[in-house]
Amino acid sequence: MPGKPNRHRTKKFQWHKFHLFDQKLKNWDKIFYIDINMRIHFDIEPILKLNPENKLFARADSYPDYDRDLSSQFFKESKYYEKLNKNYNLSIKDYFQTGLMFYDTEIIKSDTKDNLIKLSEEFPLSCTNEQGIMNLHFGFVENNYQELDINVGEYKTY
């Protein structure tokens, strides 16, 4: 992995978020996911009252300046980069970060988890584990990502 050859030694959990799109999670109507290192400072009820009907709500990774694009999630030196760039618009600046996601489980199809894994195998050049791959899938293949509004109720989501 260019630039991060020992990442596997320091980052114990990688790619685990694909399990959030396993068929078993369809036992619930909606899923609210938050990374363990995030802190909740205010009531999250206004977010939970939103209706992500057939959507995945998340904050844009490059907010507030939108100065990075999706290509920043992948190693450009990889032999797979040209194909990736040809197949997907890597210049988008509102790609999402996977630290906080709220979604309708209707977006989970029988093959969603497998398709995420296949994408990661087809394009093994992600420098942020699942985040770039999930953007390809939910932002382009399924087109059901929607940026979570900055203001929800009286609170800011970022």
What are these regions (language model features)?
Residues M1-Y158:
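Glycosyltransferase catalytic domains, chiefly GT-A lineage
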